[in-house]
Amino acid sequence: MSKDKALLRINQLKEQLNLWSKQYYVDDNPSVDDTEYDLALKELISLETLYPELITSDSPSQKVGGMVSEKFLKITHKTPMLSLGNVFSFDEFLDFNTQISKISNTLDNQYVAELKIDGLSISLVYENGSLVSAATRGNGVVGEDVTINARTIKSIPLKISKKERVEVRGEIYLSKAEFEKINQKRLLNNEDLFINPRNAAAGTLRQLDSKIVASRNLDAFLYYYISDDSNNLTQYQSILKLNELGFKTNKETMLCKNLDEIKAYIDKYTNLKNDLDYQIDGIVFKINDKNLQNSLGFTSKIPKWAIAYKFPAEIKQTKLLDIFATVGRTGKITYNAKLEPVFLMGAKISAATLNNAEYIKTKDLRINSIVKIKKAGDVIPEVIEAIKDEDFYKLEKFKPALYCPNCHSLLEKNENEVDQFCINSSCSMKILRSLQHFSSREAMNIVSLGDRSLEILFNLKIIQNISDIYKLEEYKDQILAIDNFGLKSYLNLIDSINMSKNNSLEKVLFGLGIRHIGSKTAKILARKYQNIDNLMSASYDELIQINSIGESLALSIIDWFKIEDNLKLIDELKSFNINFNYLGAKINSDSIIANKSFVITGTLTRPREEFKTLIENNAGKVIGSISKQTDYLLAGNNVGSKLEKAKKLGVKIIDEQQFFDLLKSEKG
């Protein structure tokens, strides 16, 4: 593949992986299974290996994972909460063990085997025997402060006997039984149902009301111990130490002394995983010997002494009862499968996504055929293929829909696109989905206006367009008359709506639903133009000069602001005092480091994210690897091979003080 084609594909993969990552870690609403994510990440890494000069610091290959919400205070982890490498078969685990043996000089390495709980990672810090902080993983460097909520979890002790500073890490989760109870209650209250236990656990831990957290019976398994004596203990002894201090650990954890025991452990829980009362998505194997752990060390992303074995996707056969279409906020038509119910990964499955008509044609899926479905992780199941037996060919071939399933307008399909679209601006389902998008967490974050509540208000004609959201106080009596919608719910709704008025420009820009503008592009445009009026005045030629803004996106922006109804909406939102200014740091385009590229290496006195932010706020960019095109290597202590490579290529090397001096100097 040529470098230009590789760059194009890398950018596509980065955007897709970052979106999937955000959906999983921030929105708690994954849209793809782990297998699809891992394959895309693998493709990205292979392309970046081929062209290392194309690696950037925002690449998913360089990230620990997750992102930090804006709802809680932030806590910087003293030791970064890293991700884990993955293997997908026992053979791949053997390859991992072979790499370990190059340091340990034996293939019989001892591992601690832990079930990989599908929950939310947590870091607990104790000082003088008291719990002083609890933080989520966040982006691995900075997490969310959830101390008040963590205190309500019965399996997290508020006091321990050890007086020295202790950090304990583990996983917050919700049992399957508690998950069912919560969803039953939400169903009775006309609230949106949680997708899965992980989604429910994450949503609960991020509640602002700790009483709600306490009522949902979150649980925790702890597995990682950091203190003054932790280096003197093996990994398994650390688990025993946690038990001794009163922490709940997983009783299924086992010290495996050889490869046979590891294989037996994998086989056992591959078969038993659905019988547990909590969800797991794999097994984590950690080297037991701490000295060997220290010798193996870390990459910037993962420990070299631990690996996650991921269970293969579960596949079952069932009958495809029907294929039906739905319409989204942009008018895009999505096809779905109605299935004969079947149990898969402990859940009853009766539907699956089929994406678009081209997907169905390619797989030649037919109504009443027997199909294979798979489910890896906790997302919507996927139809893999039809069983093409003798009966299959007697069935009628699939025919794409001609009309919108909601408003019955004729569908359109561009020659170069696989998707069909409803272009009727009055389509009620498009309008409802647009409203739900506007109020979503990633957009305006109107937390008390969930999809179900919005649908009820939409059907009652109380909300028919975006500006109606900000008129709800006029409908107080009508809203209070709705079943299960009391005064407290109403007041929370009004508070959420009023809070949304103070969002930064990128939030409302994303919420408006301009085609091709995702959350990342909205942030780029907001930082560039600072307010909505400047963006409205931008020309096509000006827009396409912005990095990552292509022709179709530039045209989409220009066309959107030409529509009279859209301009009227902006004016109405301004009349409700919606903020249309960018509230983030302003980019200093006149900085001496504008358009300069930096690679950061070694241990610094401040978090790397802080240096990255400083560079980006001064119009510079941070990349992942050294090349001839790199302008500066910012080097801390304990630097690795990047320093030698920079010297060899003649890249300017600076330390922290020189970096700050550079920022203070004027452009010549």
From Swiss-Prot:
Keyword Oxidoreductase: no
NCBIfam families linked to this entry: dnlj (TIGR00575), PRK07956.1 (NF005932)
Entry keyword Ligase: yes
Protein role: DNA ligase that catalyzes the formation of phosphodiester linkages between 5'-phosphoryl and 3'-hydroxyl groups in double-stranded DNA using NAD as a coenzyme and as the energy source for the reaction. It is essential for DNA replication and repair of damaged DNA.
Enzyme class: ligase
GO terms, biological process: DNA repair; DNA replication
BRCT domain segment(s): 588-668
GO cellular component, one term: cytosol
EC number of this enzyme: 6.5.1.2
CDD domains per UniProt: BRCT_DNA_ligase_like, LIGANc
Gene this chain is encoded by: ligA
Enzymatic reactions: NAD(+) + (deoxyribonucleotide)n-3'-hydroxyl + 5'-phospho-(deoxyribonucleotide)m = (deoxyribonucleotide)n+m + AMP + beta-nicotinamide D-nucleotide
Keywords: DNA damage, DNA repair, DNA replication, Ligase, Magnesium, Manganese, Metal-binding, NAD, Zinc
GO molecular function: DNA ligase (NAD+) activity; metal ion binding
Protein name: DNA ligase
InterPro entries tied to this protein: BRCT_dom (IPR001357), BRCT_dom_sf (IPR036420), DisA/LigA_HHH (IPR041663), DNA_ligase (IPR001679), DNA_ligase_AS (IPR018239), DNAligase_adenylation (IPR013839), DNAligase_N (IPR013840), NA-bd_OB-fold (IPR012340)
Binding-site positions, NAD(+): 34-38, 83-84, 114, 137, 171, 286, 310
Family listed: Belongs to the NAD-dependent DNA ligase family. LigA subfamily.
Residues the entry annotates as binding Zn(2+): 404, 407, 422, 427
Names of required cofactors: Mg(2+); Mn(2+)
Originating organism: Mycoplasma mycoides subsp. mycoides SC (strain CCUG 32753 / NCTC 10114 / PG1)
HAMAP family in alphabetical order: DNA_ligase_A
SMART domains: BRCT, LIGANc
Active site per UniProt: 116 (n6-amp-lysine intermediate)
